[in-house]
From Swiss-Prot:
Lineage of producing organism: Bacteria, Thermotogati, Deinococcota, Deinococci, Thermales
Gene Ontology BP, a term: tRNA modification
Family to which this protein belongs: Belongs to the IPP transferase family.
Keyword terms, alphabetized: ATP-binding, Magnesium, Nucleotide-binding, Transferase, tRNA processing
Gene this protein is translated from: miaA
Organism: Thermus thermophilus (strain ATCC BAA-163 / DSM 7039 / HB27)
Site features described as Interaction with substrate tRNA, chain residue numbers: 100
Translocase among keywords: no
Name listed for the protein in its UniProt record: tRNA dimethylallyltransferase
Function: Catalyzes the transfer of a dimethylallyl group onto the adenine at position 37 in tRNAs that read codons beginning with uridine, leading to the formation of N6-(dimethylallyl)adenosine (i(6)A).
EC number of this enzyme: 2.5.1.75
């Protein structure tokens, strides 16, 4: 089977823009690999394509869950592979687009076949995380499996899941057998200079506040006062803290900007070690379109 194209890169590098522009020229359908765009109602803070844009260029795995529903890597993998197969069955080309590196890695490299989650153990671990802190629990995981510790990084949800598996089974996740990937992939990773990206991240955050992010989060908190995982996303968490009285609006914006820059740094680190058939394009946004099209012509005849 021919490979599936993947467009990856740090947040704000222009992935959605490039995919939408490509869709004006080529009959592609986007399969989103974004951990927050799956949620309905999280629109402004995720820079989600509008309904009009998605009507022009079909998107899969966007607006498929309510904010209180959990999205695991295993669930993403099942939904994404199903969407890719569906697009291929209709003679169209799926284009995987996103910056959630662990999702993309699971697609291209396979996923460890772990036991189903145990909500009771996870709840206890969340309480322990609150009491002991992330570093203490991460050190526990690192003693058992440095590979798993590197993989979960500073992500508390992945840390809780890894420790849950370890404590229940005595075996760290990395030692479980892997399910092989269903498709082959070729990846293009946008790699703009940080001096180009970071000012754009600041301007995007300010624009999101101006477009009504605070009102969007207020509405979500009214529906979900217990702050589900979806509302821990960058931007939403910082605005929620403001709305719950922890700090002012200006500080919420400053926290948002710091958080999104830190996330972009982690994405650079992650994608720097991306395995498989990978090309890095040292551009972002509109400047990257020519290189993106050249890559598609070379490898996919588009």
């Amino acid at each position: 089977m021919e490979a599936i194209p993947v467009l990856a890169g740090p947040t704000g590098s222009g992935k959605t823009f490039l995919a939408l522009r490509l869709g004006e020229e080529v009959p592609v359908e986007v399969v989103s690999a974004d951990a927050t765009m799956v949620y309905r109602g999280l629109d402004i803070g995720t820079d989600k394509p509008t309904p009009e844009e998605r009507a022009r260029v079909p998107h899969h795995l966007v607006d498929v869950l309510e904010p209180h529903e959990a999205m695991s890597v295993a669930r993403f993998l099942a939904l994404a592979e199903e969407a890719i197969a569906h697009v291929l069955s209709r003679g169209k080309l799926p284009l995987v687009v996103g910056g959630t590196g662990y999702y993309i890695r699971a697609l291209s490299e396979g996923l460890h076949d772990l036991p189903p989650p145990d909500p009771g153990v996870q709840e206890a671990l969340w309480a322990e995380l609150e009491a002991r802190g992330l570093e203490a629990l991460l050190a526990e995981l690192a003693r058992a499996s440095p590979e798993d510790a590197r993989r979960v990084g500073k992500n508390p949800r992945r840390l809780v899941r890894a420790l849950e598996v370890l404590r229940r089974t005595g075996t760290p996740p990395a030692r479980f057998p892997k399910r092989p990937p269903r498709f082959r992939y070729k990846k293009l990773v946008l790699w703009p200079d940080r001096a180009w990206l970071f000012p754009r991240l600041e301007e995007r955050a300010k624009a999101q506040f101006a477009r009504g992010l605070v009102e969007e989060v207020r509405g979500l908190l009214e529906r979900y006062p217990r702050m589900p995982t979806a509302l821990q996303a960058i931007g939403y968490k910082e605005v929620a803290g403001h709305l719950l009285g922890a700090y002012g609006l200006e500080e919420a914006l400053e926290r948002d900007i710091r958080a999104v820059k830190a996330y972009a740094k982690r994405q650079y680190t992650w994608f720097r070690h991306e395995p498989g058939d990978v090309v890095y394009l040292p551009r972002g946004g509109e400047e990257a379109y020519v290189g993106f099209r050249d890559w598609l012509r070379l490898h996919f005849g588009l």
